[in-house]
A protein has these predicted regions:
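Domain-length cofactor-binding catalytic modules of enzymes
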Residues: 2-49, 59-62, 73-77, 85-96, ...
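Catalytic-core region of right-hand nucleic acid polymerases
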Residues: 43, 82, 90, 100-118
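Short, glycine/acidic-enriched loop or turn micro-motifs at the edges of active sites
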Residues: 70, 105, 241
Length: 394
C-alpha cells in the first residue's frame, strides 16, 4: 500500500479535504478535516485505509471519513461507504470490516424529567455503579433461554419490552423502531452462547453510562421538540451487541476472507471478480449467499444491541426510582447506531441509488422530511448524538 495519497489532496471547502481518485481507487475520498491536519507526523494509516475503501467494488459517491476518524479494522473508524445494489450480477461489496466487530454499537440519550437543582447526582452515580453491570464479563446480565434469545434476535427492542426490559412507548425514539428485519438468523452456537447472559450489560472499552446536565440550548425549536431544556438531567448510554456481535463479525470475516487469495500484494477473489488492497476489507457481493448470510446475521446482532440498550434503560429507570422517587420520568430521546450497514435509497450526485451504506463509527443524519422521521422528529429531523469517550464528560 504505497503512501501516495498526500500527492492527491485538495481543499473541498471549509472543514473538508478531498483525496482525488488515483491508482486503483474507484471514487474520490473525502475527509472532514483541514489540509493542515494532514501534515507530516499524523498517523498515515487512517487516510490510507480510507483510500483503500474507495476500491470496494460498486462504490457510489465518495468514501467518507467523519471528523473523529482514526485507525480501525479495514475501514477507518468514522468511515462511511455506500455500494450499489445494482452493481454487476449480485450487487457491490458488503464488508464486515465496514461495520466492525461491535455490531450496532450505538448511543441512547434518556430524558429524566428532573432538574439538576436539588438532585443528588452523587447518589445516583453510586446506585448506577452498583446496579449496572460493566466490564468484559457478562456477570449480572439477563439470562436468556434459547426461545427468549430467538425472540430478541428477531424482535429487537419490542421483544425486550415484551419481557419487561423497556417500554413499548420507547420504540418511537429508537432508530428504525429498534428493529432490523431478519429471516434465518443463522448465527453460530458460539455467538448464541456469548449472548445468552450479556443482555443488559454495558461492556468495556469506550462504552459508558453517563449522567449529564443540559448546559446550554442553542436550537430552541429542536430542543423543545425533543423535550430538552437547560438544567435538565439526562442519561447517555453507549453500548452495543457485546460478545454476540463480536462473534457474528468474526464468523463472517473468516467465511468471506476464505474466498480471497493474496496475489502481488493484493487480495483477489476469482469467484466474485473482486480485487482489494487489504484483506481486512474482504467483501462479498450484497446478493451472494455469503453477503446475504452476513447481512441477516448482522441484523440479528443489531436487534440484540437495540434490546441491550433497552435493558440498560430499564436498569436506569429502577435506579432513578430508588434515587429520586416518583419525580423521575425516564424517556428515550433518541437511540442511534454508529456501527451498521443498511440498504437505503439515496440521491447521489443527482442519481437515485439503492445502496448498502456502511457506517463504522458514524451515524445517519436524516432530516425531518425523511419517511422514518415521524412524531416529534417530523419537522426537525433526528438528533445526532456525539459523545466523548468514557470519562471525558460528554
Amino acid at each position: 500500500m504505497a503512501d501516495g495519497w498526500r500527492d492527491h489532496i485538495e481543499s473541498a471547502g471549509p472543514g473538508r479535504v478531498r483525496i482525488r481518485q488515483h491508482g486503483r481507487m474507484l471514487a474520490d475520498a473525502m475527509m472532514v478535516a483541514e489540509p493542515e491536519m494532514l501534515g507530516e507526523g499524523i498517523d498515515d494509516r487512517s487516510p490510507q485505509q480510507l483510500v483503500n475503501t474507495a476500491e470496494i467494488p460498486g462504490i457510489v459517491g465518495e468514501a467518507w471519513a467523519m471528523a473523529d476518524w482514526h485507525y480501525g479494522y479495514g475501514f477507518p473508524i468514522g468511515g462511511v461507504v455506500a455500494t450499489s445494489t445494482e452493481y454487476g450480477d449480485q450487487g457491490g461489496g458488503i464488508s464486515p470490516g465496514g461495520v466492525g466487530f461491535d455490531i450496532n454499537c450505538g448511543v441512547r440519550l434518556l430524558s429524566t424529567g428532573i432538574s439538576q437543582r436539588g438532585t443528588d447526582i452523587s447518589k445516583l452515580v453510586d446506585l448506577l455503579s452498583k446496579h449496572v453491570p460493566a466490564g468484559v464479563s457478562s456477570k449480572g446480565g439477563v439470562r436468556l433461554n434459547s426461545a427468549a434469545l430467538d425472540s430478541i434476535l428477531s424482535g429487537g427492542a419490542a421483544s425486550a419490552a415484551d419481557m419487561g426490559l423497556g417500554l413499548q412507548e420507547d420504540l418511537i425514539g429508537i432508530e428504525s423502531g429498534g428493529l432490523m428485519e431478519t429471516e434465518e438468523r443463522a448465527i453460530s452456537d458460539r455467538a448464541r452462547s456469548r449472548g445468552g447472559a450479556s443482555l443488559g450489560t454495558l461492556g468495556s472499552g469506550n462504552h459508558f453510562l453517563e449522567i449529564q446536565v443540559v448546559d446550554k440550548v442553542v436550537d430552541i425549536k429542536s430542543a423543545e421538540a425533543f423535550g430538552i431544556y437547560e438544567g435538565d438531567v439526562t442519561v447517555m448510554i453507549h453500548s452495543g451487541s457485546r460478545g454476540l456481535g463480536h462473534q457474528v463479525c468474526s464468523d463472517h470475516v473468516k467465511e468471506i476472507e476464505s474466498n480471497y487469495t493474496e496475489r502481488g500484494g493484493r487480495w483477489v477473489s476469482d469467484r466474485w471478480g473482486f480485487d482489494i488492497a487489504d484483506r481486512q476489507l474482504a467483501c462479498a457481493p450484497i446478493y451472494s449467499k455469503e453477503g446475504q448470510a452476513y447481512m441477516d446475521s448482522m441484523r440479528a446482532a443489531g436487534n440484540f444491541a437495540f434490546a441491550n440498550r433497552s435493558a440498560l434503560t430499564q436498569r436506569v429507570r429502577e435506579v432513578f426510582r430508588e434515587g429520586v422517587g416518583s419525580d423521575a420520568d425516564i424517556g428515550v430521546t433518541y437511540d442511534v447506531s454508529h456501527n451498521i450497514a443498511k440498504i437505503e435509497d439515496h440521491v447521489i450526485h443527482g442519481k437515485n441509488c439503492t445502496c448498502a451504506v456502511h457506517r463504522k463509527g458514524a451515524t445517519r443524519a436524516f432530516s425531518g422530511d425523511h419517511p422514518e422521521m415521524i412524531g416529534k422528529f417530523e419537522n426537525v429531523g433526528q438528533p445526532v448524538l456525539v459523545p466523548g469517550d468514557m470519562g471525558r464528560a460528554s
